[in-house]
């Protein structure tokens, strides 16, 4: 007698042959979680601000100086119809701004009632760090800088996590009058 298979038995046979001859899947690589922010430099230090805390990055705009304000308040600029106060972040923190104007950029911060532009020496764009390189153990910092640093990522050099929102809530930053 001939071996007659039912359609179901035929499908089971095909399934078994396919499973025997199928190549295995490639090994799964575990995805490394990363943290992203806007990298910038002030003096010889590297900083990174959380993505949600910087609205945009601008070239240093022309601004009008204001009387009766602290020296780190550079003035006010018209940016697309909005008046943007321009602040020298290095000056606020007690350091010198780089003399190389071409590299300077302005980080625009809008948080609660504060809308301000922070001049920094240089911006490096988006930076990505593996989360396991983060540490809350900070290197020695100036007292003026400490309230705004929330940790450090380690790469070739340390990248300090700078919070523009913490700066925007700091009374010393809000008090601009002489």
Curated annotation (Swiss-Prot):
Presence of the UniProt keyword rRNA-binding in the record: no
Domain CheW-like residue range list: 34-173
CDD domains recorded: CheW
InterPro entries to which the protein is assigned, alphabetical: CheW, CheW-like_dom_sf, CheW-lke_dom
Top-level taxon in the UniProt lineage: Bacteria
GO cellular component: cytosol
Record SUPFAM superfamilies: CheW-like
GO terms of biological process kind: chemotaxis; signal transduction
Signal peptide: none
Keyword annotations: Sensory transduction
Pfam families: CheW
Task performed by this protein: May be a part of a signal-transduction system that regulates twitching motility by controlling pilus function (extension and retraction).
Protein name in UniProt: Protein PilI
Gene name for this UniProt entry: pilI
